Amino acid sequence: VRLKPSPLNALFLAQFISAFVDNMILFIALGIIHRDGYPGYYLPLVQSTFLLSYIVLSPWVGRFADKKSKSQVLMVGNIIKTLGILLLLAKCDPALSYGVVGIGAVIYSPAKYGILPFLARGEDALLRANSRLESYTIVAILTGSVAGGYLSDISIVLSLIACIVLYIISIGVNTLIPKDPGNRGIQYRNAITEFAGDAVTLFRDKQSHFSLIGTGSFWMASAVLRMIIFAWVPLTLGISSRMDISMIIAVTGIGIAIGAVITPYLITVKEYQRTAWYGLGMGICILAFLWITTLPVAIIFLLLIGCMGGIFIVPMNACLQHVGHQTIGAGKTIAIQNFVENSFMFLGVGSYTLAFKLGVSIYTSLAAAGIVLLAFVAYLIVLTYRKE
């Protein structure tokens, strides 16, 4: 009987547990903000410190992931996240504690993708592994969010202890992932100038340029849409229960998971440019929310947004890793992708928060989110036909 999972399955399991806890924490932080009477703007602030960790540390984490063995890097990331939870248990400021969790997450991220070319040989195997990793991550995001909301209602301390136990299990599973050699020659000096140089290299390559703009605009639209739906559901559908809203938001994630699973049957890595049409569909579905007034229709469109989004993003991720692996190294590529995606999200969520403060109507923000995504997709379509 084979009790020890295959290296890829060990990675998927470790990633599932890790992402599950990452998403529990945001809802627990929400509970802590309510319990300790922090002001209302604190949740976006907590989210921002997390995104900021990604933006600030990007130049160094890719090097760290490529220099060391990736399976060790995954452990370091989870140990730092555990420290962040201990800070929350010790009643430290939630924005600071969540920022520490963000540091762990940003270290973890390049390694989980960067180890894939080492474990999955060949383009098609890499696309399949990507598709599965993305699907497991999304299921973890959905179930983790709901578990976080549910547990933090019962007991915040208990839910934090559950997080620590799960991280320890994930660290244990990491020991089953084989060690890749790593590249000891990588230096941390000149990290910023070389990071900028690597970014220029990726943006000069047509494939990776397309993928970076594509994934960045997808995550920006998703992050803003999530914030808007929080306000849109009570306003338009008259539903105010937090648990219900989290379930409605979860529908998009289910759509993304479906999209990620069916992608390999629709698009190959070489046809990555066809993904732009699915981005177009996603943008149109977001704009449709200006006319939606009933729950069943909203659910159908959220499912569609997710599904189109999943097909939009998975081939671009695989394409970017393929180019990166051949040019600047897998870990550095993911670090630049993280930097681009989180900068896009930071700008999107920041603009939305500002608009909200200035009293701009939620429908105007919704229209803006759809139009901005469509503008980026139009740019991708122009890019495709410009150099044929």
Language model features by range: what are they?
Residues 1-8, 179-212:
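Juxtamembrane intracellular "pre-TM" segments in multi-pass secondary transporters
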Residues 9-26, 47-65, 69-81, 97-152, ...:
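Substrate-agnostic recognition of the 12-TM MFS/MFS-like secondary transporter fold
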Residues 26-41, 227-243:
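Short amphipathic helix-loop junctions that connect adjacent transmembrane helices
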Residues 39-47, 240-249, 330, 334:
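Juxtamembrane helix-start elements in MFS-like secondary transporters
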Residues 72-87, 273-288, 370:
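Structural signature of the two symmetry-related core transmembrane helices
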Residues 114, 118-119, 160-189, 381-388:
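Helix-loop junctions on the cytosolic side of multi-pass membrane transporters
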Residues 150-165, 241-246, 353-373:
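A membrane-interface helix-boundary motif in multi-pass transporters
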Residues 273-313:
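C-terminal transmembrane helical hairpin of 12-TM major facilitator-type secondary transporters
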